[in-house]
Amino acid sequence: MQARSAKAGLSRALGHEEPARTGSANHSTLGINLTGELYAKLSGKRCRPFNSDFKVRIDLKSQTRFYYPDAMVSCDQIEGDSTYLDNPIVVAEILSPSTRRVDLGEKFEAYLSLPSLRAILLIEPDFPHVILHRGNSSGEFTIEVFKSLETEIPLPEIDVSLPMTRLYERITPTKS
């Protein structure tokens, strides 16, 4: 029971506190769908997906922070005993009431400081809605929004396209 109550509190990393995850069934299912789709589409390729158990390290001017995105992709060689990434090319956050403020604020701003990052996916778990922030070589980001289950999210940065139908498979809508 002690481990469970510890998870309900805050996870700490180098003086930085991040709210513990308390995701819904939709959040969990969407996370599995996303990482499963990335894994299947990247199989045999240079880039490698990671789930929410793996953290990203972000060196800011004043401090180093660690975050646990819901999914991320790196195209660099990663040692098997590594405990974090410095250089994801894609990061995905599945939004939830308990983490939305941090995901869209502090974490989003920190992700933007990663020189390697080319795409940030912000995903609603309860209805089809994905916001893609795509970066270019000059560090500017553009926004694309996907709401139709009939569309695919193109990620040429990793040579993958994510079908919305696969991401939202087995999701029970709670909002419209």
Whereabouts are the PLM-identified features?
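Gly/Pro/Ser/Thr-rich low-complexity, intrinsically disordered segments predominantly at protein N-termini
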Residues: 1-176
